[in-house]
Amino acid sequence: MTERFTGRLADVIRRPLITEKATRALELNQYTFEVDHRAAKPDIKAAVEQLFDVKVTGISTMNPPRRSRRVGRFAGKRAQVKKAVVRLAEGSSIQLFPES
């Protein structure tokens, strides 16, 4: 784990990504999260294991380039996002959708 997120592991994971592809990956015990763009794989692993009490077997990350956005005559950039696909050990699962 890097020094940046020591003691602040809850700040690493922003939100789960619920897309068609991510939903299909749930069947393979893979969960997709939007994470802080400065987080390294050890940070993400430690955060998921601590927050959800599961065992992580692997992580794949994607850091796509920022996209430009125009509003009238003003140009800007969208916030930088980093996606992480987390593979869990057999028998581990994360409850993303609460049962009611």
Curated annotation (Swiss-Prot):
Signal peptide: none annotated. InterPro entries: Nucleotide-bd_a/b_plait_sf (IPR012677), Ribosomal_uL23-like (IPR013025), Ribosomal_uL23/eL15/eS24_sf (IPR012678), Ribosomal_uL23_CS (IPR001014). It comes from the Bacteria. One of its GO terms (biological process) is translation. One of the early assembly proteins it binds 23S rRNA. One of the proteins that surrounds the polypeptide exit tunnel on the outside of the ribosome. Forms the main docking site for trigger factor binding to the ribosome. HAMAP family: Ribosomal_uL23_B. This is Large ribosomal subunit protein uL23. The gene is rplW.
